C-alpha cells in the first residue's frame, strides 16, 4: 500500500471498529486500522484477527494495522471514528492537527457528549471547524455478525452530498451490507443514543420477569420518546421508522448480544449498577447516554418518562421493579399525546 492511498483510516480498534475495518477491506479497499494501545495493535498484527472480540474472523490482506496516529491519518482523507461517546471530543481534538488538508470525517459512535448532552455533530464542529465534511453511520449492527459477513443494513447521513455518495459506495456490498442514505443528520445521530437507553429498560423488564408483552410495550413507547425528542430537535419523524431508529431499537432491546440489554437484565434481577458494569466488562454506552438524553430532554422541554425512570435506577438508587411500577401507574392518556 502506498503511504497515502488508503480508502479509509479507522480510528478505534475495538470490536465495532475492527468489524467495520474488516467489512471495508473485504470490499476490496485498502484500510488502515489505528488503536491507542501499541501492544494491542501489535497483537492484532501478529494474530491477523481480533482474538479478544472477533476470534473467528481473519483480517483481509488489505487491512493494515497502525499504532502511530500521524501515519494512520496521513494514509487516507477519509477518517472513520469508532470510539465511545465519552471520549469522542477528546479523540477529535487529538487528531485535528494531524489530519490531511482534504480530510473528511465520519463516525459510527452512538451517543451524545458526556455531561452536556450535545449532539456529536456539535462536538465535531467545535473540535474541527466548519470546513470539514462530516457524516454519521448508524443502525442495527452487532459487530460479530457484521464481521462474519451476515446480512446487515445501516443508515448514512452527511453534511456533504459528495461525501455521502462516496461513503455509500465504499461501504455498500450487495452480498451482505446495505447502506441507505438519509438526509436527516440530526435524526440518524439521535436514534443511536436513545435506543441505548431504552435497551437498558427492556433488559430491566425482562430481568424482572415481566415477559414479552411488557418488553414490546416498552419498545413501542420508547420509540415514541425517541420521536418526540427528535421532533423537538428538528429531526424528520420518518427517520425513526428506519434503520437508525426502529431498526436499531428492536435489535438492541431483543438480543442478548446487546451490552445495554444485558446490563439492564442484571439490574432487573437485583444486581447493583457497579457490579453489573463490571460483569459486562466492556463500555455500556447506555449508562452515560441515559444521563445525556435526560439532559437533552429537559433542555428542550420534552417529557420522556421511560428515560426518567431508567435514570432514577442508574443514578439515584431506585429499584428497577419500583421504577417499572411507577411507569405502569401513570395516568391514563391518549396514545398519540406528546407526553
Swiss-Prot record:
Active site annotation, chain numbering: 195
Annotated source species: Escherichia coli O17:K52:H18 (strain UMN026 / ExPEC)
Record flagged with keyword Oxidoreductase: yes
Pathway(s) served: Membrane lipid metabolism; glycerophospholipid metabolism
Name of protein: Glycerol-3-phosphate dehydrogenase [NAD(P)+]
Domain of life: Bacteria
Gene expressing this chain: gpsA
PANTHER family according to UniProt: GLYCEROL-3-PHOSPHATE DEHYDROGENASE (PTHR11728), GLYCEROL-3-PHOSPHATE DEHYDROGENASE [NAD(+)] 2, CHLOROPLASTIC (PTHR11728:SF1)
Molecular function (Gene Ontology), one example: glycerol-3-phosphate dehydrogenase [NAD(P)+] activity
Amino acid at each position: 500500500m502506498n503511504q497515502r492511498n488508503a480508502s479509509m483510516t479507522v480510528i478505534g480498534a475495538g470490536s465495532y471498529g475492527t468489524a467495520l475495518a474488516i467489512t471495508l477491506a473485504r470490499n476490496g479497499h485498502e484500510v488502515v486500522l489505528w488503536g491507542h494501545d501499541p501492544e494491542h495493535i501489535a497483537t492484532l498484527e501478529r494474530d491477523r484477527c481480533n482474538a479478544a472480540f472477533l476470534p473467528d474472523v481473519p483480517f483481509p490482506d488489505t487491512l493494515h494495522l497502525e499504532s502511530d496516529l500521524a501515519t494512520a491519518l496521513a494514509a487516507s482523507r477519509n477518517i472513520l471514528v469508532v470510539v465511545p461517546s465519552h471520549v469522542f471530543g477528546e479523540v477529535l481534538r487529538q487528531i485535528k492537527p494531524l489530519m490531511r488538508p482534504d480530510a473528511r470525517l465520519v463516525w459510527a459512535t452512538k451517543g451524545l457528549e458526556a455531561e452536556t448532552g450535545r449532539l456529536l455533530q456539535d462536538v465535531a464542529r467545535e473540535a474541527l471547524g466548519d470546513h470539514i465534511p462530516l457524516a454519521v453511520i448508524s443502525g442495527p449492527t452487532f459487530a460479530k455478525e457484521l464481521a462474519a459477513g451476515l446480512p446487515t443494513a445501516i443508515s448514512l447521513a452527511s453534511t456533504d452530498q459528495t461525501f455521502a455518495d462516496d461513503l455509500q459506495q465504499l461501504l455498500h456490498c450487495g452480498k451482505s451490507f446495505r447502506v441507505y442514505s438519509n438526509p436527516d443528520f440530526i435524526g440518524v445521530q439521535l436514534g443511536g443514543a436513545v435506543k441505548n437507553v431504552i435497551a437498558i429498560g427492556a433488559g430491566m423488564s425482562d430481568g424482572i420477569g415481566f415477559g414479552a408483552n411488557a418488553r414490546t410495550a416498552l419498545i413501542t413507547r420508547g420509540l415514541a420518546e425517541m420521536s418526540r425528542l427528535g421532533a423537538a430537535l428538528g429531526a424528520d419523524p420518518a427517520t425513526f421508522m428506519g434503520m437508525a431508529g426502529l431498526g436499531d431499537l428492536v435489535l438492541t432491546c431483543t438480543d442478548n448480544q446487546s451490552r445495554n440489554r444485558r446490563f439492564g437484565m442484571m439490574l432487573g434481577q437485583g444486581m447493583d449498577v457497579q457490579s453489573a458494569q463490571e460483569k459486562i466488562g466492556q463500555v455500556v454506552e447506555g449508562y452515560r447516554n441515559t444521563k445525556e438524553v435526560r439532559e437533552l430532554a429537559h433542555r428542550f422541554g420534552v417529557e420522556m418518562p421511560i428515560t426518567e425512570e431508567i435514570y432514577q435506577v442508574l443514578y439515584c438508587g431506585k429499584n428497577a421493579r419500583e421504577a417499572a411500577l411507577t411507569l405502569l401507574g401513570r395516568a391514563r392518556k391518549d396514545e398519540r399525546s406528546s407526553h
